[in-house]
């Protein structure tokens, strides 16, 4: 039996027959099919695009009062809490947000002179 004949035989098998074949090969040769699959899955996970981002206020810049107002609008914090966040920059403003939301927040803050990082 050559390689092509083996492949044709495998193509003709049902899922249950393939499952039995894999188990028989594992037993016969003392290997597991799970190890290579886990390695491939791990590589694929690393290649996936990041979906959650953190918005970090790096510095307030010259227009601190305007930045405090925008921080209040974004976070829903009170005046005192928003001022503390701005005074203690670099500070995370929002964590685990979508890329679009992170870019929107970054744009709002940069418009009033703040320096912002999206991580």
From Swiss-Prot:
Which GO CC annotations does the UniProt entry carry? cytosolic large ribosomal subunit
Q: Which GO terms describe its molecular function?
A: mRNA binding; structural constituent of ribosome
User: Which cysteine pairs make disulfide bonds?
Assistant: none
Q: Which family does it belong to?
A: Belongs to the bacterial ribosomal protein bL12 family.
Q: What does this protein do?
A: Forms part of the ribosomal stalk which helps the ribosome interact with GTP-bound translation factors. Is thus essential for accurate translation.
Q: NCBIfam families this protein is in?
A: L12 (TIGR00855)
The name on file for this protein is Large ribosomal subunit protein bL12
Q: Which organism is it from?
A: Lysinibacillus sphaericus (strain C3-41)
């Amino acid at each position: 039996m050559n390689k092509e004949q083996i492949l044709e035989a495998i193509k003709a098998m049902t899922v249950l027959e393939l499952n039995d074949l894999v188990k028989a090969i594992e037993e016969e040769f003392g290997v597991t099919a799970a190890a290579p699959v886990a390695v491939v899955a791990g590589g694929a996970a690393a290649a996936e695009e990041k979906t959650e981002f953190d918005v970090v206020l790096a510095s307030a810049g010259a227009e601190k009062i305007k930045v405090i107002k925008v921080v209040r609008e974004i976070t829903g914090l009170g005046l005192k809490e928003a001022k503390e966040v701005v005074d203690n920059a670099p500070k995370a403003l929002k964590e685990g947000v979508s890329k679009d939301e992170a870019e929107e927040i970054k744009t709002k803050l940069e418009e009033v002179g703040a320096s912002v990082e999206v991580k």
